[in-house]
């Protein structure tokens, strides 16, 4: 019965530019993923619709097309696995780099989406990979290396204006975490102010980017906050204060964004060595009892700021708080133990 209605839709109702065609193709592929007879035809139909819509390069469809590609990627892996075809990272890469019907030289935005799909799946495999044996650890290291290589290729082969919003965010975030974080700024700026010269296409691109604007603001701030240029760090601090003000005045504030902005203020003011500002920003983070994600680091940075202000007792309380509450979090408990011992020695020799 499902197959009957599925076939009738493609015969009578399918139209180029229809969001329903993308949605139905994705839903059908998911529905048939355990069906030996229907999974491959459903996959081919999904490929055809993705390519048809992607070749039009319509910015109004970009976000929906990205979602369709992401859906295709997950279901393609799950369906092949259900049918006993386990695809390794190289098989996935070959499939998406040579996607049926795509001209990688001409269909730049669609090609970038497909590249990003490979990266996302490889990252997911890396994150889930076990590390119990030497062989497993070697496999995980190989996946990590492949992710880095794929990002290098993505940056090399595409201009910022070629890239759809999700890809801009992911590549920007990756670059923001490297030794040259400011390389990421162009990717975030493309979301905040697209370089598209045609006003109609630019408006459509801006509308498509809107759901990623906050990611771009925070990503750009992180990149600037890691700069060695104090003026750029000051810009990052202002960006986070502006975001906090915006959320605080909103009738429906984004609590996650507020926590992230407050945490970034602690980090950026610490990088700026503005110790009173670090203490104040950390106090505000700690005042909100729902803010827990980065609390150990906030406590540590505030403890360092107290040390710089020669407030040794307050610094000790922070370091002891970390060692007492977050023993298992070695990233912060280990330096907190050393800082605690050093602070005790300083206090006792004064």
Regions found by a protein language model. Name each.
Residues 1-350:
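Acidic, polar-rich low-complexity tracts and alpha-helical solenoid repeat scaffolds
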């Amino acid at each position: 019965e499902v197959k009957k209605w599925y076939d009738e839709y493609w015969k009578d109702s399918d139209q180029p530019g229809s969001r329903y065609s993308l949605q139905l193709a994705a839903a059908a592929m998911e529905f048939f993923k355990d069906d030996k007879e229907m999974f491959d035809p459903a996959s081919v139909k999904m490929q055809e619709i993705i390519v048809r819509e992607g070749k039009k390069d319509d910015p109004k469809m970009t976000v929906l097309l990205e979602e369709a590609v992401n859906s295709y990627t997950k279901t393609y892996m799950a369906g092949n696995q259900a049918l006993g075809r386990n695809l390794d990272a190289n098989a996935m890469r070959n499939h998406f780099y040579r996607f049926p019907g795509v001209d990688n030289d001409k269909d730049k935005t669609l090609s970038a989406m497909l590249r990003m799909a490979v990266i996302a799946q490889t990252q997911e495999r890396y994150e889930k990979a076990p590390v119990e044996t030497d062989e497993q650890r070697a496999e995980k290291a190989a996946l990590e290396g492949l992710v880095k290589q794929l990002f290098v290729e993505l940056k090399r082969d595409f201009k910022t204006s070629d890239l759809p919003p999700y890809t801009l965010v992911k590549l920007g975030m990756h670059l923001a975490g490297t030794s040259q974080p400011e390389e990421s700024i162009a990717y975030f700026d493309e979301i905040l102010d697209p370089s598209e010269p045609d006003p109609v296409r630019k408006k459509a691109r801006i509308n498509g980017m809107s759901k990623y604007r906050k990611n771009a603001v925070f990503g750009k701030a992180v990149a600037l906050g890691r700069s060695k240029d104090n003026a750029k760090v000051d810009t990052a601090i202002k960006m986070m204060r502006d975001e906090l003000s915006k959320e605080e005045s909103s009738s429906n504030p984004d609590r996650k964004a507020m926590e992230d902005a407050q945490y970034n203020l602690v980090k950026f003011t610490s990088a700026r060595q503005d110790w009173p500002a670090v203490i104040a920003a950390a106090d505000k983070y700690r005042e909100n009892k729902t803010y827990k994600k980065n609390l150990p680091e906030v406590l540590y940075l505030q403890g360092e700021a107290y040390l710089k202000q020669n407030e040794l007792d307050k610094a000790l309380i922070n370091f002891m708080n970390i060692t007492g509450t977050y023993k298992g979090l070695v990233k912060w408990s280990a330096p907190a133990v050393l800082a605690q011992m050093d602070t005790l020695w300083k206090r006792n020799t004064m």
